[in-house]
Amino acid sequence: MQISDFILVIIGSVALAAGVKYVFTLTSGSNKDKKGGEAEKGKQVEKALDPQEYRKFQLKEKFIVNHNTRIFRFALPNEDDILGLPIGQHISLRAVVGGKEVYRPYTPISSDEERGYFDLLIKVYEKGAMSGYVDNMFIGDSIEVKGPKGKFNYQPNMRKSIGMLAGGTGITPMLQVIKAILKNPSDKTEISLVFGNITEEDILLKKELDELAEKHPQFKVYYVLNNPPKGWTQGVGFVSKEIIESRLPSPSDQTMVIMCGPPMMNKAMTGHLETIGFNESNIFTF
């Protein structure tokens, strides 16, 4: 189920005139915001991104995911505009924090099928300059965005199998690729995702991932938790070489592994993959 398939239920007192931030929770409902990926006849679809300059986008809505993670929805200039972000690419956010310019890369969890806005899943860190800045924005405030950026360009059926290793909010570029593959009937790429987190509550977008796996046999997901709950039946501890060997495709010219997580995780995973037999050309780190 996509974010655009939810209705918004306001919790707490909010008052735009008083400058109070909007806080939302999510329940299933209407998909009225989703316009679809096809252009209406007679209308030109405008891409909102510019790779050469930063453009301002207003915060439209804010969704609470858990105690430290939010989904921020930013409005595009017109309701029929698309962000214009190729699969596998990301955007750069710029803001002035404490008198200094701060830049951070983010991958939207929305796609160009959702017109008029884009969604960012952001974990708010206690001392995170950009995440704290965005979390403190009021509805109507603007953030500067530039893109597309990135070196990964996904093409349908570019490999027979793609393995994915994600940690925390590193799930965002993975979800972008997963959804692109699964919505294309002619793309037969097999996808295997290993997703590491600390607790079950930390697993972001779990419901959507589980629904995609249930609906599409070509997609499999395996969760690994440092601190699992009682009765947990999947991976425990850290993502190991043994887990990678059993859950991801074997090395070959027709397979590759893409990963996104904390730097220490990426370094460890690269070591495991090389030990298993993956060469550098078949490994990509976001």
UniProtKB/Swiss-Prot annotation:
Broadest EC class assigned to this enzyme: oxidoreductase
Lipid bilayer topology: Single-pass membrane protein
Essential cofactor(s): FAD
Residues annotated for FAD binding in this entry: 135-150, 161-193
Chief place where the protein resides: endoplasmic reticulum
Subcellular location: Endoplasmic reticulum membrane; Mitochondrion outer membrane
Record-level GO cellular component terms: endoplasmic reticulum membrane; mitochondrial outer membrane
Reactions the enzyme catalyzes: 2 Fe(III)-[cytochrome b5] + NADH = 2 Fe(II)-[cytochrome b5] + NAD(+) + H(+)
Residue ranges of the TM segments: 6-26
Occurrences of domain FAD-binding FR-type (ranges): 52-155
Entry-linked InterPro entries: CBR-like (IPR001834), Cbr1-like_FAD-bd_dom (IPR008333), FAD-bd_FR_type (IPR017927), Flavoprot_Pyr_Nucl_cyt_Rdtase (IPR001709), FNR_nucleotide-bd (IPR039261), OxRdtase_FAD/NAD-bd (IPR001433), Riboflavin_synthase-like_b-brl (IPR017938)
Keywords: Endoplasmic reticulum, FAD, Flavoprotein, Membrane, Mitochondrion, Mitochondrion outer membrane, NAD, Oxidoreductase, Transmembrane, Transmembrane helix
Function in brief: Electron donor reductase for cytochrome b5. The cytochrome b5/NADH cytochrome b5 reductase electron transfer system supports the catalytic activity of several sterol biosynthetic enzymes.
Record note on quaternary structure: Monomer.
Name under which the protein is recorded: NADH-cytochrome b5 reductase 1
UniProt source species: Dictyostelium discoideum (Social amoeba)
Native organism taxonomy: Eukaryota, Amoebozoa, Evosea, Eumycetozoa, Dictyostelia
